[in-house]
C-alpha cells in the first residue's frame, strides 16, 4: 500500500495528549507509526556511556504515534485533510480530498 503520510509532511494530531497540535513528520516507521517533531514527548532515563561521550540524565525525546492518530494538514483550507491517489502524466501523485490540490513532496 502506498504511504499516505510521508517524511516532511505537516500533520495535525487527532487523538491523545497532544490533540490539535501541528508538527512535521521526521520519520515513518514500518510498524504503522510516525515520529512527529515536538509531539508525544517522553522522558528517557539515559545511562552515561563515557566511551561514546554520552552524558547521563533524564532526556526528553519524541516517541512514535500511530499513523491513524494523525492527519495531513492542508494549508489552503487550514484544516486536517484526507489523501487520495491518482495518475497524472504517468506518475502516481497524492492529492487532498477536500480541494483536489496535489500534495507537494
Swiss-Prot record:
Keywords, sorted A to Z: Ribonucleoprotein, Ribosomal protein, RNA-binding, rRNA-binding
GO term, biological process aspect, one: translation
GO cellular component, one term: ribonucleoprotein complex
InterPro entries for this protein: KOW (IPR005824), Rib_uL2_dom2 (IPR014722), Ribosomal_uL24 (IPR003256), Ribosomal_uL24_CS (IPR005825), Ribosomal_uL24_KOW (IPR041988), Translation_prot_SH3-like_sf (IPR008991)
GO molecular function: rRNA binding; structural constituent of ribosome
Cross-referenced Gene3D superfamilies: 2.30.30.30
Alphabetized Pfam families for the sequence: KOW (PF00467), ribosomal_L24 (PF17136)
Keyword Transmembrane (UniProt): no
Disulfide bonds: none
Family that this chain belongs to: Belongs to the universal ribosomal protein uL24 family.
Subunit structure, interactors included: Part of the 50S ribosomal subunit.
Family matches, as NCBIfam families: rplX_bact
Job description of the protein: One of two assembly initiator proteins, it binds directly to the 5'-end of the 23S rRNA, where it nucleates assembly of the 50S subunit. One of the proteins that surrounds the polypeptide exit tunnel on the outside of the subunit.
Protein name in the entry: Large ribosomal subunit protein uL24
Amino acid at each position: 500500500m502506498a504511504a499516505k503520510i510521508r517524511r516532511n509532511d505537516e500533520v495535525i494530531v487527532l487523538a491523545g495528549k497532544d490533540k490539535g497540535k501541528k508538527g512535521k513528520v521526521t520519520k515513518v516507521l514500518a510498524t504503522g507509526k510516525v515520529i512527529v517533531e515536538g509531539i508525544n514527548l517522553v522522558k528517557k532515563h539515559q545511562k552515561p556511556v563515557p566511551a561514546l561521550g554520552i552524558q547521563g540524565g533524564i532526556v526528553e525525546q519524541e516517541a512514535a504515534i500511530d499513523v491513524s492518530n494523525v492527519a495531513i494538514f492542508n494549508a489552503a483550507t487550514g484544516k486536517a485533510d484526507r489523501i487520495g491517489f491518482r495518475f497524472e502524466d504517468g506518475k502516481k501523485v497524492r492529492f487532498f480530498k477536500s480541494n483536489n490540490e496535489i500534495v507537494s513532496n
